[in-house]
Amino acid sequence: AVRKALLDAALAAPVLKKGLFRSPVILESIELLRQGSRFLCRVRSRDGAEGVSVAHSTMSRLYPLFLHNIQPFFLGKDARDLDQLLEKVFIYGFNFRYNGISLGIPLATLEFAILDLLGRMTGLPVTKLVGDLHHPQVEVYRATEFRELPLEEHFRRVKESLAEHEFTALKIKVGYLMYMTADLNAKEPVGKSERLIPMVREAYPQLTLYADANGYYDVAGAIRVGRILQENKFAYFEEPVMYDHFEDIKAVADALEMPVANGEQDQ
């Protein structure tokens, strides 16, 4: 109850520091610029301030939602009301029906452009617009795929990926690829992840390690693999079960001592 009260209070608190802006910042133009499969968002205020953001690669499929579901709502609005706008846009045009990545990526693209505009106006980094700077430097981890490959090839590709740059952390995929396959009954080779986990830890004792199952396991399977991750000192287990199966997520989290993370499509 205490933890929930703290979370509720944090959610109710304002995020953007509106006091930094004395007069309205009216969004006069919102553009989505395209070069091939790459997109930029550019916003301008009525007073000529400008902000730019780089869109996620999936904008090539989601740009109609940006143009029809998000852009019209924000045009003419005061950017100082960003907190409220990010909530009310879900009501506009029944946008809540597109919750998750479908709406989240176009919306985040515009949000970043607006924050860039406000940051340029004040000369402040975004961290100073929405809070305080806690970490002047952020470590970068190497995310890898390869879960559809046989064990030895998977492990080799992970090592090759790490050799490209100096990383202090690594994320591996466990479970099995549930997309990009026509086989409706595709299953992970028995014992593959169970063998991969200690192989990676033994090879990289100095690295911070993460594991992502992309929702492959049921509760029992996730707990079993999670305990192997714990034994090998992995820092967190991402999407052990389907991201919207909240009771299953809780069951896994309660059974493990390590942190359990949910995915980017969950809002």
Range-by-range predicted roles:
Residues 46-121:
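Metal- or metallocofactor-binding catalytic centers and their adjacent structured scaffolds
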Residues 38, 63, 245-249:
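Short, well-ordered alpha-helical microsegments
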Residues 27, 48, 70, 110, ...:
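Conserved, mostly hydrophobic/aromatic
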Residues 111-149:
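Glycine-rich, aromatic-flanked loop segments that form ligand/cofactor-binding clefts
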Residues 240-244, 262-267:
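A general structural motif
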Residues 8-56:
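Structured beta-strand/loop patches that form or line metal/cofactor-binding pockets in enzymes
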Residues 1-7:
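N-terminal export leaders
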Residues 136-256:
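Metal-dependent enolase-superfamily TIM-barrel catalytic cores that perform enediolate-based chemistry
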